[in-house]
UniProtKB/Swiss-Prot annotation:
Residues 1-102 form the CMP/dCMP-type deaminase domain. This is tRNA(cytosine(8)) deaminase. It is an enzyme of class 3 (hydrolase). Its cofactor is Zn(2+). SMART domains: THUMP. Belongs to the cytidine and deoxycytidylate deaminase family. Catalyzes the deamimation of cytosine to uracil at position 8 of tRNA in 30 different tRNAs. This editing guarantees the proper folding and functionality of the tRNAs.
Amino acid sequence: MKVSLAGQTVDVKKILNEIPKRTVTAALLEGGEIVAVEEADDEHAERKLVRRHDVEGKVVFVTARPCLYCARELAEAGVAGVVYLGRGRGLGPYYLARSGVEVVEVHPDEPLGYDPVDRLDVLLTFGGNPYLTEEDVAARVYCLLTGRGFDADIAPAPENLSGRVEIMVTRGDPDEAVELLKEELPVFRIRRFLISGEFDRDELRERILEDIEPRILDPFAVRARIARAGAFSSSREAEVFIGDVLTSVGREVNLNDPRTVVTVDVLGPRVSVGVEKR
């Protein structure tokens, strides 16, 4: 993907392959080439770039949507253009545009789709952060994975499931991708889907007994969170199915005990099962 602004042509994929992916990164561009890079730590990457480098008349590439405060500093420093990963303007990009700075938003999935990817290898969940949208996180994940040699289809979860990003690794080892995401994005909850592909109740039963049952502590509860109609007709049906499987191996299911929760996510014909201790 290439975009043009402020007299420069920016090759988005090329830039992503050349910058660090540990956290939010801001790159200063001249003639479409990187001349300086700063990473976020105790302060935002864009502010570090402005403070340490001459950005006047140049283009800045950011791997997240700039906040309002960074946007003000970028505009005051005289940047000519800003390219950022994400979807939706927000206050930062809106301020830049009002200040006469060319702004281009890019996303790995243009146009962005809200349907889950065909096969869900990884589910990333986050919450409680008012400054991050599902699209922002999807863009960061794309930046990180492609920069390390993976190819992946990434989509924010449907609108009724906020704080979730779904990932299908199309090139590279999904297990390695998961470990990379856990290492580089420790603030997010990242897990492999135990079930991928077509729904199969016999296979689901085997996975429950193999992966879920040994990790459960008595007494425990069983819960089901239904994301989309399909495999089960209701959350209660999913609860009963999981409960029956566990009861068949000697686990008494107490649906009212909140201390340990077995979560069932039903996405179309795909089902994943995970354990959450509380």
